[in-house]
Amino acid sequence: TVRVPLISMFGASNELPEDDSLNALHDRMLFRFMVNNVYDASNRMLMYNGFLERRNPKTNKKQITTITIEELQDINHAAKFVVIPKNVLNQYDQLLMTLETSNQIVVTDRRKNEGLAVLQASAILEGRDVATVDDFRYLTSVWWQRPEDIKVVYEAIMKVVNPYEAK
C-alpha cells in the first residue's frame, strides 16, 4: 500500500445520488455545478473537435498545468491565516439559519465548516488577508443539496453580498 495525499478531487455525473449510502461521499464534493447538455450546433462541433484532437496522438498536446503543486500548497497554507471578522462570521451564521428556518435548506456541518475555508481561499486569491461578505458569492456553489435549492441559495447569498441590487 502506498499512501498518497489527496490534494483535490473532481467528479462529474449525469445524475445526483439518490441512494442514502452515497450521501457522505456526495457531501465531500464541495463545489457543485449543474451543467446543461450542449444544444448549440457550433458549440457541439467545438466539443467534438476538441475531443477528437485530444484522442489523436499526432495532435495531442501535452497538458500545461497552470498552477504547480507548490503554489497550491502555498495558497492553502496562506488561506489558513486569513481572518474572518466576527461581524462576517455572524452574517455567515445568520445566513445559514435563514436558509434552514425560512427555506428548509439544511447545510451539513461539514459544508458549514468547509464554507469558512472557501471564504479564506477567496480572500487570499483576491489578495486580502481578511474575509468579507463579498467572499460569500462562492458559497452559491457550495451550500445547495438539491437542484431546486440552487436559486434559493443564490438569492439568499446575493441579498447579503449586494443588498441594494437584491431589492
For each feature predicted by the language model, list its residue ranges:
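Canonical AAA+ ATPase core
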Residues: T1-T65, N76
